[in-house]
């Protein structure tokens, strides 16, 4: 199986600094995977050399030209290796985390994700519900566009089809372009031996399940559907718990709404995870109407992330406009902290939503950092005679 030996090349602790790629490869002659986090314009040259040496690649870099991605993914297919990325926030291969992620129990679910936080959220939920994963393969945010053609998604599907440890596969993505979606569905229905859940966050169509595919529009629902494939008794138990939590959350929200004054009409959300931001946007728009966002495809409601918020606004701080020449907000939360405090000062804001992404390679003490930010935002509002509700989604495990 293609990824069986991935951890082998990670067991040696390198204490040397290398001045060239050649010297690094000589030192790790049995390596079968490499991770790149370099400026996007330099990815093609280095990635080409690594792929030709039959190394799988995890590419955290953003700002990689589209034509370079197409070239490199075709080259990867020719050499029978994975090109995970660009903008791959997370992959978890044989329990080893690349990029951001958490320690997840081993299990029988394979995850394919176009985004890092999609893999993180689904894998941590599976762990919480008592299940685990075989691998989580990040394919990059553009892989499911028609011009890329789902090259690495289809390659990852091939890997899971031939993996005896994978019983079911979860694919997590924002909306998939039509040609690629149809290609994936046809391949599963006609050739797959495994069961699939396709989580298409924000999909406008109500798609009918088939014998091999269940469709979902939210990550939590998709995880529950995967669980049903594997253990129906556990599915029923967890579903009852989730329904109870939802009812308790509704009661809490109704209680907190009584604390807001008539001017506090708007919601603001500031996210480190793009999938979490997009999923929140979809849910909110079903409840309160259109939301301004740097993830919006509607020109009327699309705003630059560093522009002032308008009415109801959700911002993904992991977008390229924020990560050019600065660390990702999961690593450096300071920029987002300042924006939270700024918008909390707006007398028309009643609710702030944030995500807190914990785990490997995230900022140290991130929980305490964000707790202090939330506390300060609430105290500032209180000094001005207002109450402020802050909702934080924590993505992580206790491992």
Predicted features, each with a name:
Residues 1-399:
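Catalytic-core regions of core metabolic enzymes
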């Amino acid at each position: 199986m293609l990824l069986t030996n991935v951890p082998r090349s990670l067991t040696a602790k390198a204490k040397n600094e290398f001045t060239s790629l050649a010297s690094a490869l000589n030192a790790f002659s049995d390596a079968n995977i490499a991770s790149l986090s370099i400026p996007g314009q330099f990815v093609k040259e280095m990635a080409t050399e690594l792929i030709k040496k039959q190394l799988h690649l995890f590419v955290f870099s953003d700002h990689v030209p589209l034509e370079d991605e197409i070239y490199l993914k075709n080259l990867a297919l020719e050499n029978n290796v994975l090109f995970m990325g660009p903008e791959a926030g997370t992959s978890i291969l044989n329990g080893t985390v690349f990029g951001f992620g958490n320690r997840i129990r081993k299990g029988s679910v394979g995850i394919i994700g176009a985004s890092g936080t999609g893999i993180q959220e689904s894998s941590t939920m599976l762990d919480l519900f008592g299940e685990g994963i075989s691998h989580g393969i990040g394919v990059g945010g553009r892989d499911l566009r028609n011009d890329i053609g789902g090259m690495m998604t289809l390659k990852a599907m091939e890997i899971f089809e031939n993996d005896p440890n994978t019983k079911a596969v979860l694919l997590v993505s924002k909306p998939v372009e039509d040609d690629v979606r149809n290609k994936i569905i046809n391949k599963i229905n006609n050739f797959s031996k495994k069961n699939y859940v396709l989580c298409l966050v924000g999909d406008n169509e109500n798609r009918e399940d088939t014998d091999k595919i269940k469709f979902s529009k939210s990550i939590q629902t998709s995880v529950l559907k995967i669980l049903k494939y594997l253990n129906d008794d556990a599915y029923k138990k967890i579903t009852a718990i989730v329904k109870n939590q939802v009812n308790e959350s509704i009661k809490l929200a109704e209680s907190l709404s009584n604390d807001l004054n008539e001017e506090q009409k708007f919601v603001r959300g500031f996210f480190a995870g793009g999938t979490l931001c997009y999923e929140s946007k979809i849910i909110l728009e079903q409840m309160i109407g259109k939301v301004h966002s740097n993830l919006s495809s509607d020109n009327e409601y699309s705003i630059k992330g560093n522009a002032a918020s308008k009415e109801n606004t959700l911002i993904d701080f992991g977008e390229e406009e924020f990560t050019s020449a600065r660390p990702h907000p999961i690593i450096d939360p300071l920029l987002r902290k300042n924006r939270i405090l700024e918008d909390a000062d707006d007398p028309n804001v009643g609710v702030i939503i944030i995500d807190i992404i914990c785990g490997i390679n995230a900022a140290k003490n991130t929980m305490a950092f964000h707790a202090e930010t939330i506390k300060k935002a609430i105290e500032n509002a209180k000094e001005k005679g207002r109450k402020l509700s802050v909702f934080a989604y924590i993505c992580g495990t206790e491992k």
